[in-house]
Amino acid sequence: MKISVKLIKELRIKTGSGYLECKRALQKSNGNIINAINYLRIVGTDIAQRKVLRKTKFGRIFSYCSKNLGVLLELTSETDFVSKNEEFKNFGEKIVNFSGNNKIFDLTEINEIFNSKKINFISRVRENIEINKIKYITGNIIESYQHLGKIGVIISGKMLSPNTHLNTTKCFKNIAMHVAAAAPLYLSELDIPNNVLQKETDIQKSIAKKTGKSSKILQAIIKGRLKKFISEITLINQNFIINPKITIHDYLKENQVWINNFIRLQVGENIDNLNT
């Protein structure tokens, strides 16, 4: 039977599917909108199931912030083109807001809740979409920073003296920007797991022994290199990117504030910040 453009348009509005897909569905359903929708759902689910194993290396980071809660979510796709799609952005915002509003942070649970919507989305864009990572943070002061949708940072902290709100906000925003750029793994030396420090110590011992120096000098070399290692991976010991002459610790002290915790997500990054 001949399918009118008006009917195809109506089905497209209802399902978000392409023109030719809607036309084919209506032809298969003899022009019945309800049957056409069901047909698209069946075909779309089949297409989606074939695509879910494809790798997703592009995507965006989404954030949710309330007075004392922050959530970061990584939603990934196969291509950069889809990750810039408005529907992709809306889907990511919907998920992260749901997580924050309902205080659900378990990735498996979030995937189960949004699975049917994700499958429908995959069938429309014809490529795999993954709800890849989710992190959350709590605290009295929450500040966030997003860099081009590819890196997201949220920090929690506290005032050590009655600073003005404007100064505090600016201070924490600067630190969030620093975390985005410098990618610290831990807040302080106390947060570094013993096995990480031990592994680095063993590596530096092996390197130092090759110098043929005396035991006393070797100990000094190892100690110096470990100190450098710690300063590179801990937030408060890093040189402040905005003013490299001081450390983050110096900046915090100067502004009479402190960082309790932070989370950072970057699209496609496999190294987890163990601060969560």
UniProtKB/Swiss-Prot annotation:
Location in or out of the cell: Cytoplasm
Location, primary (coarse class): cytoplasm
UniProt keyword list: Cytoplasm, Elongation factor, Protein biosynthesis
One example GO MF annotation: translation elongation factor activity
SUPFAM superfamilies, sorted: Elongation factor Ts (EF-Ts), dimerisation domain (SSF54713), UBA-like (SSF46934)
A single Gene Ontology CC term: cytoplasm
Highest taxon above the source species: Bacteria
CDD domains: UBA_EF-Ts (cd14275)
Pfam families membership: EF_TS
Region (Involved in Mg(2+) ion dislocation from EF-Tu): 79-82
InterPro entries: EF-Ts_dimer_sf (IPR036402), Transl_elong_EFTs/EF1B (IPR001816), Transl_elong_EFTs/EF1B_dimer (IPR014039), Transl_elong_Ts_CS (IPR018101), UBA-like_sf (IPR009060)
Protein family according to the UniProt entry: Belongs to the EF-Ts family.
Known function: Associates with the EF-Tu.GDP complex and induces the exchange of GDP to GTP. It remains bound to the aminoacyl-tRNA.EF-Tu.GTP complex up to the GTP hydrolysis stage on the ribosome.
Protein name: Elongation factor Ts
Source organism of this protein record: Buchnera aphidicola subsp. Cinara cedri (strain Cc)
